[in-house]
Amino acid sequence: MPHRYFTTEIADGTATLRGADAHHLARVMRGKLGDTVILCDGNAVEYTAVITGFGPETVEFSVEPGYPSAAEPSVEVTLFAGYPKQDKLEQVIRHGVELGCAHFVPFFSRYCVAAPKKEEQKNERYNRIAFEAAKQCGRGILPDVALPLPNFGAVCRSLEGYDLVLFCYECGGAPLRELLANVRPADGKKPKIAVITGAEGGFAAEEAEMAAQAGAKTVGLGPRKKM
């Protein structure tokens, strides 16, 4: 299977790869003239590309016409994730990318154990993790990670424009399958779904009420079953 790389420098049948990925292809993978790779523009369009040249910090390609990436889900998912303790947000982002999330919005809430600290520096690292995960699992877009929201009220004020908002509540709710049954594309656009998950401490009752007032649908995964 050809290696995959992201680049926005694709036009008129040619493309350029720069930076760490160019170094990886040229030095680590020892790419040669005529080798074929897959390039993705980060907007779910992929290109079959043939290496035509190497510069000091670039790799040049000729590319065939683009085609839609088959790796993207039929919905656009934003994950609002309660900020977990230690480095667990890295795992949330990595696995969320693998599962098809397009956007990540961490937030602090009543029962979060973690506290804000050097969030701008962390955000750079989180976006790098999302980028690497997208490359590794063959995504057609570059998922992004926002700076964390300071409280749950800020989350609720961010929920306009979604076709469906799912509030994952430990006290139960409607079956997920039922809530997703009527989600359909409209006017050729992907449905936009927001999923809200809590940190280790879950949600306060008043936060659940705020979510409902903001239009969120409370969802549960059903009762635990004994093995």
What are these regions (language model features)?
Residues 70-167:
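RNA substrate-binding interface of SAM-dependent RNA methyltransferases
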Residues 4, 36-37, 59, 76-78, ...:
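Structural motif
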